[in-house]
């Protein structure tokens, strides 16, 4: 089997191939200097940046080609002012934050309060001599900050713009950011179309891997690409021996002529029951395998690392209520998919009215159901304030994998997902398992 793995990098001043080479080195469990013994660097004929290569590994899953969706060059022209305004807005509107981010907010408030208390105590204790000291220190206080500002302005600007600026521009659909968001998504869709429309049909499956902000981009790409393809995804419901939870969702449609059969409780995955999650994931793969020859959809897996989607109620919507509305209206795909009717029966089929004004039932997956056949695995470090579990927001069919045995308390854990052994072991499980698993 030959598969393609697409890596989507996160925030920061990334350079082309920087994330891809480090990721492949971590997954293979070797230093980058040893990679030349096991991989082939080949031209990337799909991306148009002229800066990228694809790394081909022959030992794993027969053959795996690693691609990088590089988007940093599209994120230019960011200034620090709107980024700081966004940060201040969140600081002074804690009600907009979820529970995990509110802990960070309380930490910032505690630091600011401690500084204010320390200055007050200093004034009360040393007040009498403070007047004399002010005569000397005021000029220094006037000159010093200007010197420090001149010295550090470049670094502060780089820190704010180069890191937080990426997240601000992609996650906020303000008018100045719309073109940037569109350019990044267009580049990703072009890559996915190229992999699917390859004349040689080299790949049997495609896996998307997104780190940090790259996981949000990967989620968006699956959403938009599925909307292009879903009308061509027609289900085969005749294979009686391989009925799955997904096909039973279709067959229990209240729109069917016969009385709808109720869904069994075991058909619905539960985050409290890992076996039910694994059963659902198996059914996703069975459905894909049963329809593989006719499916125009090769993306079998989404793997997210340190994903800010764990804060989707803050970053993608204005609170949990609006996120729920978006999911119910299938603007935000979930796993399992939301049904098409208000009775929450998991309806995945649709009726069309043709030119003859006759209703024709077509068994297809609706435009918000990519995770009927695409599995979602989410890896996170418990200490990572950016990443975290996502199944509580996007559905119990997602496999959340906490990486608690290493790097569990490090504040730098967000950038350690392919640098620690336990994380790389989970990555290998997600990327190189058999297609039937």
Indicate where each model-derived feature is located:
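Low-complexity, intrinsically disordered/propeptide-like segments
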Residues: 53-55, 137, 266
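Canonical alpha-helical transmembrane segments of integral membrane proteins
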Residues: 103-123
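Serine-dependent carboxylesterase/thioesterase catalytic core
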Residues: 2-41, 171-348, 376
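Lipolytic serine-hydrolase domain surface
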Residues: 10-13, 18-21, 25, 29, ...
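Acidic/proline-rich low-complexity IDRs
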Residues: 49, 118, 129, 262-265
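Active-site catalytic motif of lipid deacylating hydrolases and related acyltransferases
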Residues: 13, 60-108, 128-202, 414
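Short, flexible coil/linker elements and helix-boundary hinge sites characteristic
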Residues: 29, 126-127, 143-144, 154, ...
